[in-house]
Structures are given as structure tokens and as C-alpha cells.
A protein has these predicted regions:
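Short, structured protein-protein interaction patches enriched in aromatics and acidic/basic residues
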Residues: 34-54
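Sterically constrained small-residue positions within well-ordered secondary structures
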Residues: 26, 46, 58-60
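An N-terminal amphipathic alpha-helical segment
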Residues: 1-28
Length: 72
């Protein structure tokens, strides 16, 4: 499975959310998106759940959050 990387660290809201949504819209059936953010995006996680995406979250050693997202 190929991964589309969206690194939105260091951006001011709402740009990280907008980049995440753009990445989701471009996500193919057999692709995974790796989203890297400065903080846990709780509103985005609710949208992912509502829209049926599979996602996992992990904190990196540098404090950033990695979210792996794919279509169900």
C-alpha cells in the first residue's frame, strides 16, 4: 500500500485541517495517508469516524502526532 504524506506541522489553523481534507479527497482506494501534525486533531478524528475511514494515531519522539488514514 502506497502512502501519501501530508506534513502540516508548523502551520496555523485552519491550514492543517484544510490540507488534511485535500489529502483525503485525493486518497485512492489502495492508498494510505500519513498525516503529521503538531497536535491531536480531535475534530478531524470525528469526521474520519463519521465518514468511515480507518485511522490510527501515534505520538512521535519529537512530540508530533502521526495519523495513518485509509478508506475502509
Amino acid at each position: 500500500m502506497s502512502a501519501r504524506v501530508v506534513d502540516a506541522r508548523g502551520l496555523e489553523p485552519p491550514e492543517p485541517f484544510e490540507r488534511a481534507m485535500e489529502g483525503l479527497m485525493a486518497l485512492g482506494k489502495d492508498e494510505e495517508m500519513l498525516l503529521i501534525l503538531d497536535r491531536m486533531p480531535h475534530p478531524l478524528l470525528r469526521i474520519l469516524d463519521r465518514d468511515g475511514y480507518v485511522h490510527t494515531e501515534a505520538f512521535r519522539d519529537d512530540g508530533a502526532v502521526e495519523i495513518r488514514i485509509r478508506q475502509r
